């Protein structure tokens, strides 16, 4: 299946174009015929099963992985801010948040102060990175990503290990950051269905793009509002998959049908 994403409703030039991207490792296909345009101010969420190629797609986009075939085209003015899933710190070498952020080349003290203030973590400035909570670490990594004032923010599974309330708070923070920077957002999610409500498009990837669509707005559901409250309902969306095929446990396409099917997690 070959689905081209994302729709361009304002005749903008894309920040990044992925054209017919294929990545093969030792005869094993990781990505097949991926076509993706990332436009200014768009918010894109990528979901899919473990081992489905989400990380390979990000690495290809970030120039960390050379595609076997296909082309990645970058606009002249693209500036990427990257938030990794996690970082590994040596506990025998303590480093403060301020010192960690200052390691980014050419960054001034005032720029660090602005980023910390923007994410409401100025109080963490002198704290050791090794002692931060998971949520605090995510905010610090986000602060580092926005230091160069990116017009594309790339986040790798930022809500992994975070409960639904924490996810809503993080999605709200990402939305506020996107609005302040006037940037595009490309986010990978470990959850197949729970996504950021502001996503303009959700792509399901399992080697290829299986389906694409928009999340359901949960704030329109009075039952959900009563159960979870306004903050979660406003920031969390639910994505319904619409596949016309399904995959084996090894990821191979093994048939087509007209009904929507669920993604299979190949690690199970």
Curated annotation (Swiss-Prot):
Gene3D superfamilies listed in its UniProt record: P-loop containing nucleotide triphosphate hydrolases
All copies of domain ABC transporter, residue ranges: 16-231
Keyword flag Zinc: yes
Chain positions recorded as ATP binding sites: 48-55
Family classification: Belongs to the ABC transporter superfamily. Zinc importer (TC 3.A.1.15.5) family.
Function: Part of the ABC transporter complex ZnuABC involved in zinc import. Responsible for energy coupling to the transport system.
Name of the protein described by the UniProt record: Zinc import ATP-binding protein ZnuC
Record organism: Haemophilus influenzae (strain ATCC 51907 / DSM 11121 / KW20 / Rd)
Lineage: Bacteria, Pseudomonadati, Pseudomonadota, Gammaproteobacteria, Pasteurellales
Gene from which this protein is expressed: znuC
């Amino acid at each position: 299946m070959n689905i081209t994403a994302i729709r361009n409703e304002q005749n903008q030039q894309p920040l990044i174009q992925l054209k017919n991207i294929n990545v093969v490792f030792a005869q094993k296909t990781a990505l097949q015929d991926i076509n993706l345009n990332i436009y200014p101010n768009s918010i894109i969420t990528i979901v899919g099963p473990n081992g489905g190629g989400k990380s390979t797609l990000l690495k290809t986009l970030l120039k960390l992985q050379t595609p076997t075939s296909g082309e990645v085209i970058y606009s002249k003015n693209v500036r990427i801010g990257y938030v990794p899933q996690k970082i590994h710190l040596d506990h025998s070498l303590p480093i403060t948040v301020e010192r960690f952020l200052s390691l980014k080349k050419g960054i001034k003290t005032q720029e660090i102060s602005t980023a910390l203030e923007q994410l409401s973590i100025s109080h963490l400035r002198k704290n050791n990175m090794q002692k931060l909570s998971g949520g605090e670490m995510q905010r610090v990594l986000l602060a580092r990503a926005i230091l160069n004032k990116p017009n594309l923010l790339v986040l790798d599974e930022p809500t992994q290990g975070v409960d639904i309330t924490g996810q809503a708070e993080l999605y709200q923070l990402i939305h506020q950051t996107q609005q302040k920077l006037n940037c595009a957002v490309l986010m990978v999610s470990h959850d197949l269905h729970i996504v950021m409500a502001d996503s303009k498009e959700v792509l399901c990837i399992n080697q290829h793009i299986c389906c694409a669509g928009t999340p359901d707005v949960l704030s329109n559901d009075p039952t959900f509002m009563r159960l979870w409250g306004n903050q979660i309902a406003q920031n969390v969306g639910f994505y319904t998959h619409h596949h016309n095929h399904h995959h084996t446990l090894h990821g191979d396409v093994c048939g087509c049908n007209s009904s929507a099917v669920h993604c299979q997690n190949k690690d199970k």
